[in-house]
Amino acid sequence: EHRFFHWHLEFPEVFADGGFDCVLGNPPWEKVKIIEKKWFNGKNDDIATSTSKTKRNKLINDLNVSNPCLYNQWKAALKDSELTAKYLLKSGSFSLSAVGDLNTYPIFADLCIFQILHPEGMSGIVVKTGIATDYFTKDLFSTILENDMLVSLYDFINSERIFPDIAPPERFCLLTISGSRRPSKESTFSYFNTNFRSLSDASRKYTLTKEDVNLINPNTKNCPAFHNIRDKKIILSIYRNCPVLLDETCGKNFWSIKYYAMFHMANDSKFFSENTYEKLLNDGYTLISGNIFRRNADAFLPLWEAKYFHLYNHRFGTFEGVPIERRFIKKAGTEKVTLEQKIAPDYSILPRYWLNHKDFIDRLEEMEYSQKWIFTFRDVTNTTTNARSAVGTISPCYPCSDKSPCLIFGDTSANNVILFQSLFSSIIFDYCVRISLGGAKFAWYILKQLPVLPPSTYTPALIDFIAPRVIELTYTAWDLEPFARDVLAEVGVAQWNAWFPANPVGDDGTPRPFVWDEERRFDLRCDL
C-alpha cells in the first residue's frame, strides 16, 4: 500500500562504491500536509469552497453523521499525512530539508544531493526555485553553497507553459550539483527565463560566490535573483555601502524594529469571521466615525487588510458597494476609492470584517503598543504586474490581518516613523525588494535583510526636506488626526506653520488634513 523503498537494499553494489555517479530527476512538488479545501474538492463542495477555517472544521466534523464514509476517508488521509511528516521530521535523515511547512521537493533534493550521490558525481534536478530563495530551504541551500557543491541554477517562470499543467506564475529551476569531492568555487545563475532560448543570452548569466550571497543575505544565506549582470553589480555595490535592516549574525538593528502579524486570517477567524456589515447592523450596532460600529459602550473596529492601502494612502480600496456574494470569495476584490472620496477628509473605507474592540486591546497589550496610528505593509505582492513591490504606509491603528503586518519601532516618535516611511517608499528600496523576492510573499525574513540607511544618516537638513513632504502625503483624513497631533507635539506649532503656511494649526490647536491634490502629490513623491 505505501510502497516502502530503501536505496541501499535496492542498489547494494552502487552504495558499496559510494553512490550514483549521476542523478537526474524531476521530483514532485507537493505539500506533505493535507490542504482541506484541496482534498475536499470534488468530494464536498461546501467544505471545498468555505473561506472560514472555523466553518470548515465544523462542516468536516458534521460529516461523522451526514457522510461517515467520507469522514473515515478524511481521517485516514489525515493520519497518513501526519505519519509521513513524523517520519520526515523525526528519522534524522532529512534534518536540512524537513523544516517548516513540509514540501516534497526539498526532501527529494536532499536525497539526491547528500544521500545517494557519489562524492565525485553530478546531479541535475528540476525543482521549485524556492529551493534557493525560500525561508524554510535556507539551511539546505546554504549547506550546498558552503560545501562548494552548486554548479548552476537556471530559473524559469512558467509563462510560456513549459509545463502545460502548471500555473503560469509558477517558478522552477534546473539545479546542477557536484559531489562533495568535486568542488565548484563559483556558481552560475540565470533568473526569470521564460524559455530555453534565453539561456544563451550571456548578459542574463552571472556568477556568485558564497561570500557574495552572505553579504546580501547574511541571516538566511539564500540566493538573490538578478535579471542580469548589471543588477548584480548594482546590488552588490548597495550592500557594500549600506547595512541590512536587522543583521542576526551580529545583532545590529539600527531602527530597533519589531514585526507583528496581529490576526491570522485563518487561525484567528473566530475573532471576526461572523462580524460582517449586515450582521452587525442586524445586531443593533450603528456605524459611526466612518467605519466603526458602536452599540452603547461596545465597539467593533475594521479589520485592516492589505488591499485597503497603498504608498502614502490608507484609503486605497474599499468594500463599499461590493455585493455580499463577491465580498467573501477567495481573492475578493475591492472597489478603488474615487478621487471625490479621497478629497473628502471625513471619508473612511469600509472593510469586509470587523473585530471587537476588547479583543484588539488585548492584542495591543501583548505588543506593548499604545499609539493611535501604526506602520503597516503588504506582505503579498506581484513583481511582474505591480508597479511597486514594497507597499506600506502609516495608517490608523486598527486590527491588522497577517497579510498586512505591522512594524513597531524602538523610537516610537512620529518623526522616526516618517523617515522610515520615506525610505520604505523609495524607488531604490523597491528595486532591492524586487531583487530579493523569490515569489509573491514579502516575508519578514526578506525585509530584515534589505539594505537601509541608519537613522543617523538623516541630518537636520534632510529631515527638514523629507518630513513635511511625508506628513502632507500621509495626513489626508481625520482618522489620522492622532498622527498629526503627535507630529505637532514633537515639532511645535511654529515649525508646523513654517512647514505648512497654507495649512497652519487652527485655533483649536488641531491642524486640518491636507487636501488631496493629485498633481501636488505627484510632485511631492518625485521630490522624495
Regions found by a protein language model. Give the residues of each.
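S-adenosyl-L-methionine
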Residues: 2-528
